Design a protein with these regions (language model features):
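Functional cation/ligand-contacting sites centered on basic and imidazole/sulfhydryl donors
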Residues: 1-318
Length: 318
């Protein structure tokens, strides 16, 4: 049984999460604002940047490059995969962040309430550990691990999405050509980022997340990344950063002009992904590759992707 105070807290968290889980823009902004209130929550800033990238991927589907190579059904399924993952991660993670905020406000840990938000047992233990040890790096990694396992079964292994999105020729083109990339722009015209080849592999995504965290918080680059995020409003279009690269014409739309708010449902009795002990290596740091600046790469890959989709269109429609 919850006390009256606990009931008030849980209901407030549910209301706030629902209000800010409206679409990619509200989620991205909520993550950023939470980090500004609690800078020890590194994952929240990383999540905001990754969520920005998800929004850019969504509007790519309606842009000049991708749109001609997709049927309406394919475009809808690709958007559903991006949006559903973005929504599900926020549904799981944001209540955890808010409960931490309430714990600070009350000067006592409230993590025994995590099960009321269907949060994994894995994270209950990690939050308790963080409250005692203040190990920000471990919590960062724990949240990365948790969110990737959270989406593995309902999104990545969903039969419909697996067949029509993650095994589609368009998606395989993207993986083969290194287009599954998360980018961190700067206002002085540089683009940094990392690529994943096997997005459907949960451990590959966890490795990418840890590398992205290392890149984002690198001492010589962090202020540039944060300045971009703090000063450039998120519209969902890559034109948020392309003018800084010298690109004068917008080729992808603003997110809210092409996608209505999508209604989701969440199984309150969803199965906890944490069923067996994890490998300690998941908590180990990952080295960055030599190539982290992708400014020139970005232009080259756009040309390459245009060529690949023209080939796909030719062979499938001749």
């Amino acid at each position: 049984m919850l006390s009256q105070k606990e009931h008030i807290i849980t209901q407030q968290i549910l209301r706030e999460t629902k209000a800010k889980n409206k679409d990619n823009l509200t989620r991205t902004n909520a993550y950023k604002r939470f980090y500004d209130r609690h800078p020890e929550m590194k994952w929240s800033l990383l999540a905001s940047f990754v969520s920005r990238n998800a929004g850019w991927s969504m509007t790519d589907l309606k842009g000049e490059l991708f749109h001609p190579g997709l049927t309406d059904q394919q475009g809808h399924l690709f958007f559903t995969a991006y949006e559903r993952a973005n929504w599900l991660i926020f549904s799981d993670a944001y209540p955890q962040l808010l409960l931490y905020e309430w714990s600070k406000r009350c000067s006592q840990p409230l993590f025994h309430l995590l099960p009321y938000f269907s949060v994994s047992r894995f994270m209950s233990a990690e939050w308790e550990h963080f409250w005692l040890k203040h190990d920000t790096e471990r919590l960062l990694y724990a949240l990365i691990i948790n969110e990737q396992y959270t989406i593995q079964s309902p999104i990545i292994q969903n039969p419909l999405l697996k067949k029509n999105v993650f095994h589609s020729i368009q998606y395989l083109f993207s993986e083969w050509g290194h287009f599954q990339t998360v980018v961190f722009p700067t206002v002085d015209g540089h683009l940094y980022g990392l690529t994943i080849r096997k997005f459907s592999n949960v451990k590959e995504r966890i490795t990418l997340g840890k590398k992205l965290a290392k890149l984002l918080f690198r001492a010589d680059l962090f202020s540039d990344f944060y300045h971009f995020m703090h000063t450039v409003p998120h519209t969902g279009s890559r034109f948020d950063f392309e003018p800084f690269l010298g690109i004068a014409r917008r080729s992808t739309p603003f997110l809210r002009t092409v996608y209505p708010v999508m209604t989701h449902s969440l199984d309150d009795q969803r199965e906890d992904w944490f069923q067996k002990k994890l490998s300690p290596s998941l908590f180990e740091a990952e080295p960055l590759p030599k190539q982290i600046e992708l400014t020139d790469w970005y232009f080259h890959k756009k040309r390459q992707l245009r060529f690949l989709f023209s080939l796909e269109h030719y062979f499938l429609h001749k």
